[in-house]
């Protein structure tokens, strides 16, 4: 049985975790990866002394799968200060720790984003979600997050000034139409742990998963054209025959029969600039509330981890949810907006690179924490893994990798 030809399509988090689980059972899978390194959407480039993550990403230390698969001390995680810097109407102020200790948030600062009743409700919600299991969260009726916040009684002030800009950056959509299941899950994770990045960039996370593999082979620069039956056709024309195929990437890219079965994925544009020094000077996310900005959120990455810049300049990560501007115009518009909120002249923000991330998060109507492993099986030979089966998070990507591996192992038991 152990000489079975098992191919995994995609070396993202789900593909790597699937390989880890298959190796534990004695198999030696082969991963076909279209790019030149592991990580899928979680990648880091080294450019001119800067570490550029593909999109602003963090790891939440409370994620269950993070505890299962990652050695957090070895990643030398650098944590964000909880809360946010709010840039509003030519002014800025700090809201510290609203998701964990809302009652401790200093009155004056909080009064600018919400009412005293909001503070009490935030505290109540934090306590409720700490006690609520992840399973119970994902069994709740699915309502849009914005509706949920209104139903809970939060004021328009705190929804506009904090919840919208903060969760837009997480959900990558402007109107908070994402299921409140996801809101509760993320809120719970923030209240139980920290948002962090590995000292040397997000790429360190898939690298650590890869280091747990010993008999798995990874073929880089090997994009798959299509999968039919037990045959995998690569873009270079090579055909591979497989006993089992784990599709740990968006399946409609490689399986013609699944075209049109998935909604349009969420997109984001991530721009990087260097500046003589950070105007925030703290490891915190900066939010721009309101609907009249191009920029949604900003972070000086070297305020969080100094290794992100080996120069004498600061590295600014800027997230833009949507824009039709050509890159040159977009860069100029972002620089002008940065000047408005910081007082630093636009030309001092030196543009480094932009990442147009077309498949940042899956579009999902029905968010789940898990699924029966039988749902990972498409045919006797083809199995699916990936966050698009559950919810848009690195936790879900790793969960689905474990589930699809279990489904494959089950297919080898005599009763299946």
Language-model features and meaning:
Residues 23-47:
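Glycine-rich FAD pyrophosphate-binding loop
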Residues 48-128, 132-136, 145:
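Dinucleotide-binding Rossmann-like beta1-alpha1 core, especially the glycine-rich loop
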Residues 4-31, 409:
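N-terminal Rossmann-like FAD-binding beta1-loop-alpha1 element of flavoenzymes
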Residues 307-416:
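Conserved flavin/dinucleotide-binding core of flavoenzymes
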Residues 225-332, 340-341:
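Mid-domain catalytic core of redox enzymes
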Residues 13-14, 38, 400:
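Hydrophobic/small residue at the entry helix of a nucleotide-binding pocket
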Residues 44, 67-88, 155-161, 265, ...:
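A short alpha-helix-loop-beta-strand transition element characteristic
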Residues 124-226:
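Active-site/ligand-binding neighborhood in enzyme catalytic cores
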